[in-house]
Amino acid sequence: MTFHLDAFDLDAFVAATFAEDLGEGGDITSAAVIPADTRFTGVMDTREPIVLAGLPIAEAFFRALDPEVSIERLVEDGDRVEAGADLLRLSGKARALLTAERPALNIVQHLCGIATLTRRYVDAIAGTGAILLDTRKTIPGLRVLEKYATRMGGAENHRMGLWDAAMIKDNHVAVAGSVAEAVRRAAAAGIARIIVEVDRLDQIEPALAAGATHLLLDNMDVSVLREAVALVAGRVPTEASGGITVETIRAKAETGVTYISVGRITQSAPAADIGLDFASE
């Protein structure tokens, strides 16, 4: 099965990861301890309930070192599985599989952790109509993968980068002199999507009048957020953001906002407890 993500070169990612891990000397432990013709079978499993993300990427690490490896995928990305579930079965050259083990586990643990935390947030707002968004708070070089993981968890992607929409924040406003002036400048530059961060109710009308197409309601408590949504009255999408946790997100969603963005689903997700056990054939 071919795995493809726009703007992501999986082969280059795998090669760079191995270059970092192997250096010039290679896997000296496996070379010394494991005879060249030894074959292994292995099972990747989870020790906790998780949402899957990144299994095709883990497979790519094994196939890069053993193109003839046999891999049986037992679940698919986006699936929710219980503790003890087997994820992959593989059989191939022992040295290659041992060398690829840690990079493969690193990425699948990281991405499953993101997908699992994301699903907790999505479940918390079920039935409210609000949509969970991720943010640009990602590890440099891993954004495409991390945003893929949030999608597997049920979120939608916010901006992929600075290029795909204007987002006017407090520092832009400070330089421009006002919210309205910052929005006018973005509109004059021909930018179609203009997201404006506001943290006070009196900023809403000036932002809308100047041409904002989306309002980010930053760090507002529930009562102020509800009032802000009423003031906007559906003229543009609204987005709650700022310090939102699994425990507080539902109250924010019930104010009627269109979106809720949460940085911690990528920034603070713990790695999933996933392991890989091998045995000689």
Residue ranges and their predicted role:
Residues G275-S280:
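Active-site loop ensemble at the mouth of alpha/beta enzyme cores that anchors a bound cofactor
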